[in-house]
């Protein structure tokens, strides 16, 4: 079956890696849709515009990227959509291409697939992320009646599932918990798969290749030493949980 990639990308020095890995993406996806902020540089825009079967969507507001990428992906000729935060996807393709390809083969088997992180992948993140996201996952697991990690930034959609999300939400918000709850409430099955490849990607920024485990660990310690990062991650966890609870109890469908 045909699978379209939908992703959000805020470029932070990944250009060389994208140029190196883009051919692999084109081989596996029928089409590629990337939403980028209006601050995206000329070099990144030019590269995306020159690639075949690749659509770039410039987002007018912060937080709109996921929705707009999914919306544009629905215009492509594909049976299923793989959404993935693009910096995470580059890390995954570079560090574990076999697992990535195996996961793509699994997506058409499900109506909605949450692609989460193994414990190993989660532990590669700063503790300010790992600990606050465990709280989100506890809530998500309870609401969805199965153990899940919703913080991996990756989902598999049937066209029906994607249309449910687009119909019942508007641009803005996170979607991490909201989207699977809406799909589940609509009567579609929500499945789960944990992978190693969705390890912490932010340590890759401005590097020629993905960070090693040691480089990830050092960057994570530095990140955690800034108390404002902890405060921000607590705020994000609260927003994601509130958004999910609102969806669960049929309140607002567009948060933030």
What is each stretch, according to the model?
Residues 67-80:
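Active-site nucleotide-sugar/metal-binding loop of Leloir-type enzymes
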Residues 78-91:
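Short beta-strand-to-loop acidic/aromatic patch adjacent to the donor-nucleotide binding site
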Residues 89-122:
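Conserved donor-nucleotide/metal-binding helix-loop-beta segment in metal-dependent transferases, i.e.
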Residues 173, 177-180, 184-256:
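C-terminal catalytic/acceptor-binding lobe
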Residues 7-28, 39-42:
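Short, well-formed alpha-helical segments that are part of the catalytic scaffolds
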Residues 109-151:
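Short, flexible, basic/aromatic active-site loop/helix in glycosyltransferases
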Residues 136-137, 150-166:
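Conserved nucleotide-sugar donor-binding
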Residues 49-64:
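Conserved donor nucleotide-binding strand/loop of the catalytic core
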